[in-house]
Amino acid sequence: MTAAGVRATARIGARGDGRGGTSLPVLEGEGPLALRRTRASGSEARVMLVGAMSGPLGGDHFTVEATVAAGARLHVGSAAATIALPGQAKGEARYDVLLDVAAGGELRWLPEQLISAGGSELYVSTRIDLEPGARLVFREEQVLGRVGEEPGRLTSRLTLRIGGRAVLDQELACGPGAPGGWDGPAVLGGHRALGQLVVVRPEFEREPVRARLLGESAALTPLGGAAALVTALAPDALLLRRVLDEALSSLG
């Protein structure tokens, strides 16, 4: 820990074990980012991200990296929601997620929600790099404020590249200090939970998904090549999860 806040990195590396399963030659966490391997499901290795401390707080910088080799299947979840909080250190906290999946590898990235507590300032950056033939389910859920409080400032950027080609690059800022209109009808429309689901499957190249609405506040959009994006808004985290789960089920 420094005067500027806590610096912590967690790394996961998955590869085929030669017996039809997945091994984890790299499983390293530090400080507030603890990693625990849980019971596997078939050929899939499962890892839980456990927050060993509060945060991220102001000035903290957390990084989580996951690399999935050809033939490996990895499922990553978290034990509880992540709560961005104000801290003694001044300035914005940062949370970086770096995901790489090789051709023939599969990653299911399904953490719990990120909650932007009142007074916090957090920048979240997620960069996903896939080789053609990789498979991905990526879920991101954000809740603006705890019950009965105003949100902090939350800026989130998500980029997806397949075979080195940019397929998705979007950024959204919410809360105090964000560009005007973030809570208006063109963006959140008064909702306090927002989420997205990115699904990449090689079969989408042959049979692309069809753009359609999923209820009143969610939409499915085909992206370039083998990818599809679901974006959703909801009044709370419970309803948001329900919408995203139903969307994933509809994709088969």
UniProtKB/Swiss-Prot annotation:
- GO CC annotation, single: cytoplasm
InterPro entries on file: UreD
Instruction: List GO molecular-function terms, semicolon-separated.
Output: nickel cation binding
Keyword annotations: Chaperone, Cytoplasm, Nickel insertion
- Subunit arrangement? UreD, UreF and UreG form a complex that acts as a GTP-hydrolysis-dependent molecular chaperone, activating the urease apoprotein by helping to assemble the nickel containing metallocenter of UreC. The UreE protein probably delivers the nickel.
Membership in a protein family: Belongs to the UreD family.
Its taxonomic placement starts with:
Bacteria, Bacillati, Actinomycetota, Actinomycetes, Kitasatosporales
Q: Where in the cell is the protein located?
A: Cytoplasm
The protein depicted here goes by the name Urease accessory protein UreD
Q: What does this protein do?
A: Required for maturation of urease via the functional incorporation of the urease nickel metallocenter.
Top-level taxon in the UniProt lineage: Bacteria
